[in-house]
Amino acid sequence: METKQFKAESKRLLDLMINSIYTHKEIFLRELISNSSDAIDKIYYKTLTDDSLKFERDDYYIRVVSDKENRILKIADTGIGMTKEELENNLGVIAKSGSLQFKKENEVKEGYDIIGQFGVGFYSAFLVSDDVTVISKAFGSNEAYKWNSKGAEGYTIEPCEKEAYGTEIILKIKDNTEEENYDEFLEEYTLKSIIKKYSDFIRYPIKMDLTKTKPKEDNKEEFEEYKEEETINSMVPIWRKNKNELKSEDYENFYAEKHYGFDKPIKYIHTSVDGVVSYNAILFIPETTPYDFYTKEYEKGLELYSSGVLIMNKCGDLLPDYFGFVKGIVDSEDLSLNISREILQHDRQLKLIAKNIKTKIKNELESLLKKERDKYEKFYESFGRQLKYGVYSDFGSNKDILQDLLMFYSSKEKKMVTLAEYVSRMPEEQKYIYYAVGESNERIEKLPQIEGVLDKGYEVLYFTDDIDEFAIKMLMNYKEKEFKSVSSGDLGIEGEEKENTSNSDDKKNKELFESMKDILSGKVKDVRASKRLKNHPVCLANEGELSIEMEKVLNAMPNNQNIKADKVLEININHDVFKSLKEAYEGDKEKLKLYTDLLYNQALLIEGLAINDPVEFTNNICKIMK
């Protein structure tokens, strides 16, 4: 009998999985039972596509058997079974999912719930066993095969005898160690508890022979043990249970069973609606961002059931994109089981459900923000960007739904605040909601442009996400207060007297500023005296709708079109540097060019923009140091 080797990457993955992916060894039973449920699902799917086959539910079950004396644990099912090739392909290559392959081969796009998407769950058996045997007979085949492995070194496959189709997994449970008690995985009570904890909603019976006691017939005062078969799981979907009977742990276990994530949900929503359209739904807001969430590969959607039967694995129409992070299920008796994807997309009932779900999610998030601020801020850290994308997309049509869910870091509060909180404490004379854009809060606090607004005592919101300013441009205003960047040309904070003084400064220094503008030859739209600078000598401001930060974001995209914002070089005429500029203008034009180039490049660096000629810049610094 030949021993075959796992592929090298499979060895590494097996080691990684055992030591990293699964933190609790009891998870192995959940994974193996889920695989058994998948196998029965596949039989059921075949009956839907083959009229000659009948599905008698009583014939399909999962059985768990413990043999404490021989340290053997068996998990058997009456599912579809596997051929020799399937054993080798599905179990010989870790992370090769048989369920996923079944979906591809049978074009199962919706209509069936097959849990095993990732192909690693089976190998959790090695958490508690160092000798794993799989005996399987495929549906429609006369041959059975035995697969055996004692770990990452390899496996064997040989013919064997098995009467009925299905699969039996036989685990030789490890001996106890000082750190681990493996005996518990042979105890009836422990096995029953694990099944109830993780697999209570598996829709096929999970059977065990449980030890019970009864009085002896010849002596009623003495008791004897006997075995009686029981179905351990309830098989009643959690969403059909009374909410008052469920605990947080029940929802968390369901979340884990459905593989919605390795985290715990930060919020669950259990809702039942009766009306024009009736449905039950359980929705989850995850705690952490899925690794692929902000990629094209991520697929949003809720599982859609009709009368308890899955008809679509991920129904994207049930969620708007900005709530695409929500996981969960919807079950409605008003949807037909055989409804096609095309009809479903235009189904009136489905649209009503989607509208209700959108409102429910929004209300729950608002409640979380109001009542559990810490949880909301944790959620926002993971998914706030998606809400801002929602404001920006579809030409701002969703801004009224999302604007009260937005949060930004505040210069005054030194924490995240909502727009409503900002507006509520605006001084009466303040006209605008001010914001500053930068790579981080620390960088923003050092921006020269922010000095004038802070000096006035006004609060500034910090925008550190690429999407922030784009979203706010689409929002335009909040409670009739317009948004204003601290880098915009007109801040709207000058008094009449100061405004006149500033204009007078521009007139007095008109020739100097014109000379500087000529030196920069088209790099800036204008050079003028700054109304905002207090301690810094120079900064860049922008005019028009396109800001400097938006220029950076757009030019970083793959279709770079070399977009340029209209920039204004602002000079602090109260800074010592300005005196040097005036002296150079009056007596040394070469020095004026040197100073102008240095100040412009300094302003570029402050904005995080690249300077055109770093060598010339460093040479100019050396010149003024001589």
From Swiss-Prot:
This is Chaperone protein HtpG. Residues 553-626 are annotated as: C. Residues 342-552 are annotated as: B. GO terms for molecular function: ATP binding; ATP hydrolysis activity; ATP-dependent protein folding chaperone; unfolded protein binding. HAMAP family: HSP90 (MF_00505). Keywords: ATP-binding, Chaperone, Cytoplasm, Nucleotide-binding, Stress response. It comes from Clostridium botulinum (strain 657 / Type Ba4). One of its GO terms (cellular component) is cytoplasm. It is found in: Cytoplasm. Belongs to the heat shock protein 90 family. NCBIfam families: PRK05218.1 (NF003555). Pfam families: HATPase_c_3, HSP90.
